[in-house]
């Protein structure tokens, strides 16, 4: 059973879905396109955390086609023709409502892209910082 089905079964309507790292990259576009009319996810806000977790090279050449095959039709998918880490994370940020710079080593160009996006950005929080309060304030901004 996938998380989407479990959320529905529990009759829980999330207010925020927080995606961590590149591995969760398709979640924002699925929520914004495929589940946009679903009452459970219609008003959900999406936060994306960026880490120093770049992968070398590119994802499979058919990655864009796989996303399209799932029913996503969007002109922004063309950035995935070159599915490098940087392009994938730019794509993810375009569908997020807020962005977290979750480690000190986040790619500088991606951090700048986040800051210029006009979306709420939570800068890196050192482990000793009052992180929970800062995250709560960030979520309230979404």
Predicted ranges, named:
Residues 1-142:
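Catalytic cores of nucleotide-sugar-dependent glycosyltransferases that transfer UDP/GDP/TDP-activated
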């Amino acid at each position: 059973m996938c998380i989407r089905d479990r959320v529905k079964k529990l009759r829980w309507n999330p207010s925020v879905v927080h995606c961590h790292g590149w591995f969760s990259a398709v979640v924002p576009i699925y929520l914004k396109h495929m589940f946009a009319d679903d009452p459970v996810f219609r008003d959900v806000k999406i936060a994306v955390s960026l880490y120093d977790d770049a992968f070398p090279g590119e994802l499979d050449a058919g990655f864009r086609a796989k996303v399209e095959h799932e029913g996503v039709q969007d002109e922004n998918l063309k950035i995935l023709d070159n599915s490098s880490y940087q392009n994938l994370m730019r794509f993810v940020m375009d569908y997020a409502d807020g962005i977290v710079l979750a480690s000190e080593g986040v790619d500088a160009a991606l951090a700048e892209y986040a800051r210029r996006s006009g979306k709420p950005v939570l800068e890196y929080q050192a482990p000793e910082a009052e992180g929970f309060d800062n995250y709560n304030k960030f979520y309230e901004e979404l």
